Amino acid sequence: GKAKYVFYFIGDGMGVNQVNAAETYLGALQGRIGIEPLCFPSFPYSAFVNTQSATNGVTDSAAGGTALACGQKTKNGTLGMLKDLTTSITSIADWARNSGAAVGITTSVAIDHATPAAFYAHVKERHEQYTIGKQLVESGNDFYAGSDFTIPTDPEYPNGPTLYEEAKAKGFTIAR
């Protein structure tokens, strides 16, 4: 059958050591030796991934996010494109939306940060925040929740509409 809901949780930069440290700390808060388990390690499905980028032994959030979102490695700093910096690649969010599913992306950081942006953006450089925000508005996804756009105004047209205004015009409800 077809899944009714799919949730894809990413602990950006988080590994086994960070989870163990948090669980050990929670156990210590209760005055005991040992761990107090976090809830997510008991989810019915989980995976650990090793995400070297296409060009570096240590990935960054853009290349790592792209690998997680698109299943393809790219160079550090790049979102939603192959390392040739010309070929855009589709993400799991695109696949879901094109299959008729509603797609929402939530984050605890700026909505145009590299990890969430890997699911909707296609840019050569992760620091192209205005372009990333523009692609969010045009993505066709249904829902976004996060901390703000990093650069909401077009640097070339500072008196033009903001990304908030453009998102609202596309039917998004803006809560700030």
Where is each model-derived feature located?
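N-terminal catalytic scaffold of extracellular/periplasmic and nuclease hydrolases
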Residues: 1-176
